[in-house]
């Protein structure tokens, strides 16, 4: 107890000194990240609007100089008090190498990470579909910077527009489809029920049906834990999607002659994803609090975006005997 009291005093004294000197940014080395995670120093600094940044190891500096572009701002999700789960997805690379891969919702946080991981597997072609123009343009620029050799199509389209989606399928005939497009903000969907049904339900039906019609090998749908015994419109819409995809898979299995496999993965809280609670927490902290949660005893469990997407790849390429 005495050690803890002295340690807290030390942290408080440090922050007082920083405030007295009007320090706005602190740069730490990667080696100190683990120490930072284990202390509440980061929380206290964030409350006082002191920015945390990390520098690369000395071996990566340009000579003896450190470029500002090498500095990375530390986010709350970087302080996750556990090591990221390492999932070996290289064994699934062969399944996507040389394939035509479609990603719906490609401009979103999950869809864009799927794109990054798939791009590293050397696909024949990427078909990136989203209705958000500016984020999709950003993805296009990222592709040009990092994966110049990959043939990619960035397509603005509404997945619930059956005519438009059929044109896309007819032209590109995707072999693998990662369906991440959806509305997912619970309060917004409570107030916009028709849009939730139109995009989440009818959009999924359109993409799934076209996957079968044009002979896709696999259709991987990104769902949510809110589809379990749903208590809101968004969760209900995603549960309907799951039921439709499951029913379609059973129908095809009974009929025979179809090759499309359907896989559904459910995500819980994903750190850094659009709609994640983390940006809200960050804003509340930067405004000086309070940080609000739904219940005093609530416990939230998180996974990172790369973890979630790697898990999706792993599940998508396991055989039934592996499950």
PLM segments and residue spans:
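Flexible, Lys/Arg-rich cytosolic regulatory linkers and terminal tails that connect or flank
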Residues: 38-100, 212
């Amino acid at each position: 107890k005495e050690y803890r009291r002295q340690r807290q005093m030390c942290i408080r004294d440090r922050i007082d000194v920083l405030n007295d000197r009007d320090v706005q940014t602190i740069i730490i080395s990667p080696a100190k990240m683990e120490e930072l995670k284990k202390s509440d120093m980061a929380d206290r600094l964030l409350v006082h609007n002191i920015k945390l940044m990390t520098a690369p190891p000395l071996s990566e500096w340009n000579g003896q100089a450190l470029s500002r572009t090498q500095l990375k701002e530390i986010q709350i999700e970087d302080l996750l008090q556990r090591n990221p789960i390492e999932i070996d997805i290289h064994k699934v690379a062969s399944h996507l190498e040389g394939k035509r891969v479609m990603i719906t919702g490609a401009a979103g946080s999950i869809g864009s990470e799927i794109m990054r991981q798939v791009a590293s597997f050397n696909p024949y072609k990427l078909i990136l579909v989203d209705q958000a123009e500016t984020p999709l343009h950003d993805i296009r620029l990222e592709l040009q910077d990092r994966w110049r050799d990959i043939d990619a199509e960035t397509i603005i389209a509404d997945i619930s527009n059956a005519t438009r989606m059929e044109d896309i399928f007819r032209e590109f005939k995707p072999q693998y489809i990662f369906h991440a497009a959806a509305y997912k903000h619970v309060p917004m969907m409570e107030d916009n029920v028709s849009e939730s049904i139109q995009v989440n339900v009818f959009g999924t039906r359109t993409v799934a049906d076209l996957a079968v019609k044009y002979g896709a090998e696999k259709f991987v749908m990104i769902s949510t834990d809110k589809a379990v015994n749903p208590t809101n419109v968004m969760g209900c819409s995603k549960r309907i999607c799951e039921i439709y995809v499951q029913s379609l898979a059973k129908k095809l299995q009974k009929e025979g002659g179809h090759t499309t496999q359907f896989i559904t993965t459910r995500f819980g809280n994903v750190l850094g994803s659009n709609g994640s609670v983390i940006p809200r927490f960050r804003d509340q902290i930067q405004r000086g609090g309070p940080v609000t949660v739904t219940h005093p005893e609530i416990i939230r469990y998180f996974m990172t975006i790369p973890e979630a997407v790697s898990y999706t790849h792993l599940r998508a390429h396991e055989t039934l005997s592996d499950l």
